[in-house]
Amino acid sequence: MLMLMLVAAVTMWLRPLVTAQPLCRARTVRTGKVFNVIQDVQGDRLYFRSTTTRLIKHPCKKNIALYLGKQVFFTTDNFETSLLPFTIPTSMQVGVPEVTSAHFTGSLLLLVVNHKVYTYDYESNSWNLSLGIKHPVTHVSGDNCCYTGSLFCVDVSNLVFAYFRGDQISQTYIYYSNTGGFSFWKYHYDRQAEIVGSLGGIFHLFSLSQVGMLVVDQGKGMFKYSDHPLNRSLGLSFDYNGTLDIVIAPGQKGILLLWFEKSLLFSRNAGQLVDTVRVKKGEQTLFTSIFEAQITIHNIAVNENELAVITREDNLYYGNLGIVPSSIIKFAHQHIWSEDAALMFRSSGILEILTPVRDTAFAAFDFQKCLLNIQAILMDPDLHVGRCNIEFLKGEFTYRMYTIDMHSQLELTALLIPQPGTSLIPLVMVSNPHSLGFQATFYESGYTSDGNTKYKLDIYLKQQQHWGRTDFNFTSSLKRATMSTLTVDIANKEISCVDIKPLSTLISVGCDLDKKIVIQNTVSACSKGVLDALALQDNYSFIIEKEFYDPGFQGRQSSKDLHVFYSYQQLGCPLLVYYDTPWKPVVELWKKDRFQEVVDAEYVLLEVNGQFSYSYSLTAKSAMCTSQPQNWTTMIKESGGPFFWNRENYVSCHDPNNDAPLRWPDVQYQILGGRTANQIVFSHNNGFYVFYISIVDPYYSYCQLETVFSIYVYGAFPVQLVSAGVVMVLLISSILGSVWLAYMIPRLLRTARGRRMTSFVAQLYGRCKTVCQFRASATARTGSKPMGRHRSS
């Protein structure tokens, strides 16, 4: 009994010690300080005027970050060295060096300083003023795509907005950049002058393929979107108390955090639905909002799946950005806050509290760093956190980017294993259901070595429009390339599953860059012996006569002949085409080095040298056009040059929505392929043609499929100067004349005149024979030796 009482007493004594264990152990980073070396701050010191701090990490380069507070610090090693305050060169003449916003794009840091945008290239340590901004701005916004080797991702990261937060939307100036912030242009939002309210922010919401504008009016906030189908109405309104900062969580999942000192809001679908973040303890909801909990936020940190909040009440809160309504739990109360403290996630489940420390002897600041292991903290039984119910969650598609082109599909697979005695509820989500649809199958796939059940999740994805299950008013435009993020998570996942991250991948519903078109060339001019391949490779050239080409592509004769060099390396041996047979190329679609199909979509041809000695077999009327068709003349005039007729500006004359009247039904129909049997008809000329081909059907592929190829037209003999009828009359006349002479000459010879003529011919023949014999005998006597001396033997 005494022993039991002793154990109980020791337990009660130890319990406060256990709960009093610090959340983290602090260490101070102090480097590069030598007493005989004096460091001086060069330039104008930047500062951030706010009672709260910001710590902005580069989403793709994890060691690069910017700290915004009373002092501004920029690091390339995660603050593992002492740093001088961040400055801007005095030569930039910024005036008041106050920073109001910052954003990373590639190797650039964009800073809004005194209402202007500056770029700092940290790789070359150079500053520049962004071009094109003519009015004051306060904020920049953008996103970063971290999938390497993708041109699409580069484009995403280069798109930036600059704007003045709080301005009336109808009167404000918004700027955009597609160069990563080097240059900006005015952005014209559709019907902007009619929008009532102030500007809370404008963002590229790539998870929805929309531009989203936060409209603030009468204490309410609503997101307005740029494109169909979301542009017909505003998102649901939410309370807008104070000035909210908007944080776009990394990963293009559509997760937004909106916060200021007394409010923390959360959206999973890029602002369409915005809800408060709840405060929970175990499964119990203590408060439905931060405002209700009466806490004051000092700083927040966000990564792809996690959220951390530090408050002025010296508390730390943590939550995951899961599928269920977002919530946070409160960690044990300890002294961790200071007015300069800021949070950042070092990695999944590893949180760091960073505090700059002033050194009285040196200009460089040290950094106090307090590292927290979230998984270890969640083991505290006082938090009432359930045990993780997932043993394994994996998919080969994570950290990869996929492309679904027009009429394509994608199949992905995930493997799930629950903890023994538990069950899982898998959930598959796409961030942009307006363009990407899917079908998922969940089934048992075997057992582990310890008898636990394995499950497999098969996911089939294709364009939402091709599933046939949605209304037109729900889907986005099929012609417009979009993107979406696929996420696989567990609906009943515990917050303790810190190391079990959702499976996520980025899917571009757009151009597959591996696709190309090739012109079938089974019968070439070289294989038939018409041309010599070696000769074509030896600086071969040909002449286009001035009557048959126009450098302006308007079908007018030129003033001089054109000398053209033939590029065998680019064109190879030309396709052989007989002049008198209507023709069109056989277009093949290839993906990398594999043949896919013969293209039956609509396309256009243009001779690159301006030759116009060919026509089309169909007219607008015979092609059954219901509206006036486009042609090269009008397209060149509209675009200002050739080779700009493509899927973006093509309008079919068979489209019922095309209201251009059919005024000239007899004009040539210059589109080949598709529903018509249109072909090229060549004039009576042999020679080379070098064609540019462009697939203009907007529903065949999101790619601009184009190429250049050559043909050689043969078989056109020189044009006869006399008509065939005249030749036939002359031939028949000569035959009849010969027959008549054969009949009449014998009859004439039997007459007296005929006998006299016969005698005359005989005498003439005898005289000629005598003269010839005399000349022959004279030549024989003289010999054959030339004049001069000759040695005899």
From Swiss-Prot:
Membrane topology, from the record: Single-pass type I membrane protein
Ranges of the Extracellular topological domain: 21-725
Assigned keywords, A-Z: Cell membrane, Cell projection, Cilium, Developmental protein, Differentiation, Disulfide bond, Flagellum, Glycoprotein, Membrane, Signal, Spermatogenesis, Transmembrane, Transmembrane helix
Glycosylation, residue list: 128, 231, 241, 473, 539, 631
Membrane side Cytoplasmic: residue ranges: 748-793
Protein location: Cell projection, Cilium, Flagellum membrane
InterPro entries named in the record: CATSPERD/E, CATSPERD/E_C, CATSPERD_b-prop, Ig-like_CATSPERD
Signal peptide (from-to): 1-20
Function: Auxiliary component of the CatSper complex, a complex involved in sperm cell hyperactivation. Sperm cell hyperactivation is needed for sperm motility which is essential late in the preparation of sperm for fertilization. Required for CATSPER1 stability before intraflagellar transport and/or incorporation of the CatSper complex channel into the flagellar membrane.
Protein name, as recorded: Cation channel sperm-associated auxiliary subunit delta
Organism encoding this protein: Macaca fascicularis
